[in-house]
Amino acid sequence: MHSAPPLPLISLATTGRLDAPPLAARAALLEAPATPASFAAALGRFRDLFEQVEVAPPPAPRPAPDAPVRIAFWNVERCKHVEASARLLGGLDAAACLLCELDVGMARSGQAHTPRELARRLGAGAAFAVEFLELGLGDAKEREWHAGKVNRAGLHGAAILSPHALDRPAVIRLESGGGWFDGARGERRVGGRIALAATLRIAGIPTTLASVHLESHSDPAGRAAQMRILLGALDAYAPGQPALIGGDFNTCTIDRAWARGTGRRPVLDLERLLDPVPFEPLFEVLSGHGYHWRPCNVPGVPTQRTRPDGTPPPPLGKIDWFFARGLSASAPATVPAVDAGGRAISDHEVLVVTVAPDPAAR
């Protein structure tokens, strides 16, 4: 499904509130044929939803931070546990939290505007961009758990939270081919993978921050292709500016679409799961653009976590990363994504790193 008119690669348009399509419009999309024409029509009809970043400034902005600063990344897996997630993030003392997989008005996460709720509890501002307009209740288990309910808004996307002022928030669309529209991947969605970027001044130096989620139903070559798009977009967004990218890059070293389609789970050795660099060409792409990752990440530690329902089962892999350019990095940490009782609140751990502008890179 690839005939949709392309959305702009980068959009810096902002709004104080993203308006979700009404329930009737979303229901009509489910009733319409799942064709490229229907997908293109949906993108065109709801274009503003995908081209704008919703921005809420901090209630009491802190001064721009001095160096070094701590930055967090976390795939919050729908953010179904807002209170526990806010407590976890609040204990990190991060200048910014790069987040993906946040719901707005989804039954599975209590219909909450999760980025706004997190920001309120943290005393932070929030930038939020839509990755998908969700036409259903979620995956198979979520559809079972929430049968009979409806989504008030059906939005799902990425956010950057910070108690400091963020400049030039921008949504970067990594693809808009409609791979999730027909339901073959288990969910009906309009949209495609994104990155959310913004600029934070660190010790007076404008620094790009980006929260990223690469496609899960893909293979190493597909992930490398999305990485090329991302890095080209970041270069266009702020040429030569120091940058820190945090994301769920799904570096599982295999074609997950094939694995899920066949129901077969390849047997991979633990060393490969925890050090996917030789098997994922996106690392070579990053290196070619001047990014480094060794000082930014804890080696040999998985970033996946098994949920209370037993998924994903071990062995767990290292699929979430920080990548830095023009920054020195130190003190990386992988923080368990659990509540006060030790119960998993996401299937991804939290990543933290300390960064500072690198004078040698200027």
Where are these regions (language model features)?
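A short, charged/proline- and glycine-enriched loop
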Residues: 64-69
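Active-site beta-strand/loop signature of hydrolases that rely on acidic residues for catalysis
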Residues: 70-75, 85-111, 127-131, 161, ...
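Acidic-and-aromatic substrate-binding clefts and catalytic sites of carbohydrate-active enzymes
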Residues: 75-83, 104-109, 188, 219-221, ...
